[in-house]
Amino acid sequence: MFPMQFTNSAYRQMEPMFAPGPRGQVQPYRPRTKRRQEPQVGNAAIAALANQMSALQLQVAGLAGQARVDRRGPRRVQKSKQKKKNPSNGEKPKEKKKKQKQQEKKGSGGVIKKPRNRPGKEVRISVKRARQSTFPVYHDGAISGYAVLIGSRVFKPAHVKGKIDHPELADIKFQVAEDMDLEAAAYPKSMRDQAAEPATMMDGVYNWEYGTIRVEDNVVIDASGRGKPGDSGRAITDNSGKVVGIVLGGGPDGRRTRLSVIGFDKKMKAREIAYSEAIPWTRAPALLLLPMVIACTYNSNTFDCSKPSCQDCCITAEPKKAMAMLKDNLNDPNYWDLLIAVTTCNSARKKRAVSTSPAAVYDTQILAAHAAASPYRAYCPDCDGTACISPIAIDEVVSSGSDHVLRIRVGSQSGVTAKGGAAGETSLRYLGRDGKVHAADNTRLVVRTTAKCDVLQATGHYILASCPEGQSITVAATLDGTRHQCTTVFEHQVTEKFTRERSKGHHLSDLTKKCTRFSTTPKKSAPYLVDVYDALPISVEISTVVTCNDNQCTVKVPPGTTVKFDKKCKSAAQATVTFTSDSQTFTCEEPVLTAASITQGKPHLRSSMLPSGGKEVKARIPFPFPPETATCRVSVAPLPSITYEESDVLLAGTAKYPVLLTTRNLGFHSNATSEWIQGKYLRRIPVTPQGIELTWGNNAPLHFWSSVRYASGDADAYPWELLVHHTKHHPEYAWAFVGVACGLLVIAVCMFACACNRVRYSLVANTFNPNPPPLTALTAALCCIPGARADQPYLDIIAYLWTNSKVAFGLQCAAPVACVLIVTYALRHCRLCCKSFLGVRGWSALLVILAYVQSCKSYEHTVVVPMDPRAPSYEAVINRNGYDPLKLTIAVNFTVISPTTALEYWTCASVPIVEPPHVGCCTSVSCPSDLSTLHAFTGKAVSDVHCDVHTNVYPLLWGAAHCFCSTENTQVSAVAATVSEFCAQDSERAEAFSVHSSSVTAEVLVTLGEVVTAVHVYVDGVTSARGTDLKIVAGPITTDYSPFDRKVVRIGEEVYNYDWPPYGAGRPGTFGDIQARSTNYVKPNDLYGDIGIEVLQPTNDHVHVAYTYTTSGLLRWLQDAPKPLSVTAPHGCKISANPLLALDCGVGAVPMSINIPDAKFTRKLKDPKPSALKCVVDSCEYGVDYGGAATITYEGHEAGKCGIHSLTPGVPLRTSVVEVVAGANTVKTTFSSPTPEVTLEVEICSAMVTCASECTPPKEHVVATRPRHGSDTGGYISGPAMRWAGGIVGTLAVLFLILAVTYCVVKKCRSKRIRIVKS
């Protein structure tokens, strides 16, 4: 029933059952018995047996590479004639014989030879284990996908509809994932043994049903290419059988098949690795699988486009019929299928292909489709120094302008054989000088600008190459031993949009962004087809097509071409003859044959390097590299080493490639800076208290705040250290104080000098005065002035005043008496005013008011919250009399500024479009009245159209124009401006918006206890919200600030404030040189353009249109590197481009009123009434969130709850609700201090206590989160500084007083001096 494999030990245990009998002993014959009916077992038993067998298989796989010693020693050699074995053991004799031979292989000494590893067997075992946990899902009778049991759940893709084909799993209910294509459900416990173990999907190679799967850089490739609809949900396993993911779908990616999968890890966390072009591999119901009738027409007959009649379809057998069929069905939606059918010719027997994957086959069909067109030769201005008609002429070079990749169109076809079939990458199909189509292998195709380019891919006429910047481009190839090259002028300049890293290497990150690139995956849609027109004749030497022997001439016509030349015989006039058959002969006497040309039978692309040809589209061939919007991976530079020094952030490291460093302040003035850094670097960035945002490359922004101002010195030390500290902490206050003190000191010194001078003269006068003034007595009287101490008791002060100063005593007592009189006067007048309320009506009104107060059902809490999501949350403890406290937290979740915008126009890269020159040979031509009818302009939106007629061109030119007149030749040159083909991609298009008013919205989270309520507030009104028994009234927001100006520009994922020109006022080379408002980005019907086109007179060396124009204004604007709002927006706003929003701007505030019902409060039975509060600060570090620790002890009279919070502004305390017990209580809490000295008032219930302490400086002055404590505005002066300043001011004041008294005394004495007259 199950395949059985055993290890060596298991085989030895069962050896008596299989070993032969003793030598010479004949085994008794046992007749063949009928196999008895095996008992029916349940699903659980089957699952248990299957798991046991799987375990044995894994043991065999694990022991495959190990050698074991046979303990039984050497076994005897078996005879060549094998005995009949009893087949009752359920094993075939041949299989058993094979196993015995494997067991008998030994080396010398009885050691078994080491067998070789068998990784293929391990893979088969792992796939087999995955099958046991995989169940098909049926929908309308067909398998639509699969479900897999992994771990404790069953998984299947969400797009797989139907029921699981298992009785226990058919009716389970799945839960759909929100962000990925996955469903999961719990399965019955009885099936736990069948579940596979999960493993983590990493880069590497894994197994699935059809072969191997390679995972690399979030790209999953199916190496087998055999995935198909109906395989969605199949398991992806590693070699041990553990499931790492399930398949969702797939699609072609060039020549590969790329998958979309769901990957798991060991913890069963799922992630989706999606491919944008993948198709879900679910099988539709049988009813939808009916073949659709896809009708193409030919000769009024309808047929399936993918299966035309092979007698008429093959382009190699019947080229005229095939081309006519393609022409008749150009507008059919299934033209692509018809093109593949007529060029691949499915009826013919083909060689066995090397690769059978759908992507490889599809790529081969794309190359073979070029059989519907022919290569061509065109003018090249520089063929190694001279102009020529080249088979690899460069006809078109296209660049997005934002990267180095170029798309080059040449006249030859890459990857195509001479007959138009698919060939190797080095093959090149070209048109030779003889007018025949050739193919060359090993062409050594080279593309070069200033250096050699990397050729990424070459398909048909188009080459995709990554080139360095330059002013010209060269394409070179070796064709049949001859080296050809063509150089043309093309300014290749990369103008990158705003980017943060310039990495050219492999990206190891998972970060992606939208980008524009050339698609390398052909698709069956109109943008992937290009028109071809009638082939133009090329001039050839007459000897290549006509060979004459006397009068007999033979024309050699290459297959599928037309030969045309001028013939003049002796007896006939000159005539133009045409030949279309393979070979023809004519007779002409003295033939003069000139102007030979060959025209290909199949059409080719229109070229501006050739004259204008036919206007009718003959067919369409694949256009391999149209632009598309894709998801590109970007690099993420390693973060630098970040250290803090004083109030600065230091960045140090080494950047291997240029990385952009941007900074901005989070306040009103952003002061944005940006700098490209490469190599070793060390940058110092100052940090402000408002905060700073630092963005390194493509990493997430980092935010830093200055917790306190950095200052050296010590705030609690000697005067010189105090001076150093305060001059750095608050230099304006410190130096002002020093200046005032020095000024006062100078004045005091001057006064002291003057007083000393006066005293000297007074002493001299006293010496000669017999009655000197009472100077000594007056000076002594100053010392008798009574003093008073502020700490004396109040009654002692009153007694002193009564004794020494009756007036002062009266004034001291007058103040309280006056207060009593004022209060009495107010009460008396209040009684007169309220006399009517003292009766029955007054008492009734009083009772009603008291009843209303008692029936109040809610408690109102009001607060104003700053609108900054980066700010710390607001925390408070609600203390309501008679109730236990409640903790309230309010936090701003996000803010949104949404402007009202109007799209004025969009602009993109402008390109000129050139009509091939219309040459009038020996005649005159003129511009049409309606220039839009010119064939190059049809199907495209054009503006700034210029058309000029040039005379006297190409005199006697024998080239492509075929003009033989000297002066009558004229040419019409037409050039217009149009939008680039990249304009259809959102990331390459700039949109000009006018901004009107803005609406500001914020979401505030209110947490009361364990209940969280979200409230949306607005700038233009009050919001009323209800939570769980809460009523919240919030708003309006106090500001309508918006970072957007009146005019903004959006391009890609960035937004710019830019004053763009109005619609219709663009100028060449500036932003808005090409404008449109239509949503049809390929062909807008309201296109305005002015790119400075000027049509010039063509030179006579070749047929061409000469013109000049100005480079795209958008690219020039991007070259100026404007800074987007994501770098310059104030208040730390995050800018969203689509939709246009400003998020998380830290500006404004919102008032809130919260009505809390009585039901939220718990009534107190007893009031704890804390008393005898004492606070001891255990440690304190200022400038740090909750850097201080305090211990509060108190006595509780009753058991209950008390809220603890701070009453000091700017010093937050960790609010909490504490349990109070009767007796001694201790509470440990933390607080934040912005200053070196802190005095904190803490309230516990209704009791207050003061905590005071000196704090140490913080270790770091820069923090990564916004500080909770208040910012220091510059008014802080430490205690020691105040004491020293007070001492200095007091000393100076005393000195001034002494000097003033001395001056007055001396002045008085000198007024009574005597004159001393010398004899």
Swiss-Prot record:
Q: Where is the motif Nuclear export signal annotated in this sequence?
A: 164-174
Report the EC code(s) recorded for this entry: 3.4.21.90
Please give the SUPFAM superfamilies that the UniProt record associates with this protein. E set domains, Trypsin-like serine proteases, Viral glycoprotein, central and dimerisation domains
Region of interest called Transient transmembrane before p62-6K protein processing, as start-end residue ranges on this chain:
759-783
Q: What is the protein named? A: Structural polyprotein
According to UniProt, the reaction catalysed is: Autocatalytic release of the core protein from the N-terminus of the togavirus structural polyprotein by hydrolysis of a -Trp-|-Ser- bond
Cytoplasmic side of membrane: 755-791, 828-832, 1307-1319
Alphabetical GO CC annotations of the entry are: host cell cytoplasm; host cell plasma membrane; membrane; T=4 icosahedral viral capsid; virion membrane
Positions occupied by motif Nuclear localization signal: 74-119
Q: Which UniProt keywords apply?
A: Capsid protein, Cleavage on pair of basic residues, Disulfide bond, Fusion of virus membrane with host endosomal membrane, Fusion of virus membrane with host membrane, Glycoprotein, Host cell membrane, Host cytoplasm, Host endoplasmic reticulum, Host Golgi apparatus, Host membrane, Host nucleus, Host-virus interaction, Hydrolase, Ion channel, Ion transport, Lipoprotein, Membrane, Palmitate, Protease, RNA-binding, Serine protease, T=4 icosahedral capsid protein, Transmembrane, Transmembrane helix, Transport, Viral attachment to host cell, Viral attachment to host entry receptor, Viral ion channel, Viral penetration into host cytoplasm, Virion, Virus entry into host cell
InterPro entries recorded for this chain?
A: Alpha_E1_glycop, Alpha_E2_glycop, Alpha_E3_glycop, Alphavir_E2_A, Alphavir_E2_B, Alphavir_E2_C, Flavivir/Alphavir_Ig-like_sf, Glycoprot_cen/dimer_sf
List residues in topological domain: Extracellular: 1-733, 792-806, 854-1285
Q: What class of enzyme is it?
A: hydrolase
State the superkingdom. Answer: Viruses
Region of interest called Functions as an uncleaved signal peptide for the precursor of protein E3/E2, as start-end residue ranges on this chain: 282-301
Record lipid sites (S-palmitoyl cysteine):
783-784
Q: How is it modified after translation?
A: Structural polyprotein: Specific enzymatic cleavages in vivo yield mature proteins. Capsid protein is auto-cleaved during polyprotein translation, unmasking a signal peptide at the N-terminus of the precursor of E3/E2. The remaining polyprotein is then targeted to the host endoplasmic reticulum, where host signal peptidase cleaves it into pE2, 6K and E1 proteins. pE2 is further processed to mature E3 and E2 by host furin in trans-Golgi vesicle.
Return the Pfam families for the record. Answer: Alpha_E1_glycop (PF01589), Alpha_E2_glycop (PF00943), Alpha_E3_glycop (PF01563), Peptidase_S3 (PF00944)
